[in-house]
Curated annotation (Swiss-Prot):
Residue numbers spanned by region Disordered: 99-121
A Pfam family of this chain: DUF444
Record NCBIfam families: spore_yhbH
Protein name (record): UPF0229 protein OB2647
Family per record: Belongs to the UPF0229 family.
InterPro entries to which the protein is assigned, alphabetical: Spore_YhbH, UPF0229
Amino acid sequence: MPEEHEHNFVVSQENWSLHRKGYQDQQRHSDKVKDAIKNNLPDLVSEENIIMSNGRDVVKIPIRSLDEYKIRYNYEKSKHVGQGDGESEVGDVVARDPNASQQGQQGQGNGKKAGDQPGTDFYESEVSIAEIEEALFQELELPNLKQKDEVEITTEKIEFNDVRKKGLMGNVDKKRTILTALKRNAREGKAQITPIYNDDLRFKTWNEIIKRDSKAVVIAMMDTSASMGTFEKYMARSFFFWMNRFLRTKYDTVEFEFIAHHTEAKVVSEEDFFSKGESGGTICSSAYHKALEVIDEKFNPRSYNIYPFHFSDGENISSDNATCIDLVHEIMEKSNMFGYGEVNGYNRYSTLMNAYKNIEDPKFKHYILKEKADVYHAMKSFFHKQPEKV
């Protein structure tokens, strides 16, 4: 007597292409938003609404309108038609009057003079912090990350990397289910997909990824002296804001120490580091002494990848510069990299940068920030992603 199967499944033969129009429009809009984010990253990274909201806000960016292709009347009223000269390229406007720009009477307004032609339609789309992070963080990584004393950790991410015969219907693997049914039916002499039985069902299942990873610590040092004005402090905090989010998003075992300094340095909380201001003179070596103290007390270089970052306006007491250079070299002996960012929007003479420009150690990286967009460029400079080795 042939074995009976419970037959509860069918394969839909409906033409699903009829239902894809909305999805295609949505995907096209999503692609345009991603392009707009990528093209506006330098401005978005320094957007004050995001920095001051602690990452819980959205911003609006302009996105070019997506017009459907259609034939329309030529409002520019070109008087001639004929064969092209073969030099046209994708994106060229067809049938535009070549003399229009010379006549000075047509064209879009440029902000100084009025024009009589329609402009390009733009609309504003809200962008969340997560979308900006996705575009920014894929370009970055911790430099010179080395394998230290290993710590086994379980990542929060799960991967669907196994297939089983039992599972949740929401996780059914349609492709493998159909292949299983097709093979079984073929063995029975019927080269077709249906019928599909319970025994043919295959389900995707997941596993938590266990990996061995090295620990890292970032020592963030910021000049909070009186010479650090509103713009300088905003730029420094903007950089540290994105650095903080980047490292905590991409790495599981990164720790942070925050040091604020004027003539004296002290370890502060993350909240105080990003919110409180101080005054006084500037002795940058005080921050480096404190960083070495923190490293010696808490972070053994054999167990930690150490990344000190210092942001200042460069207005240091000249007599302190030689001490700073010696301490920077001492810190680099214990760290993977030393990053120095200087906020100098007016191209003024900087005593500290003048001293640091002679440091030739490859571990030493510096960047001068002159405008808000440089926060993005500084991030890319310090956390430049190395090409994968083939």
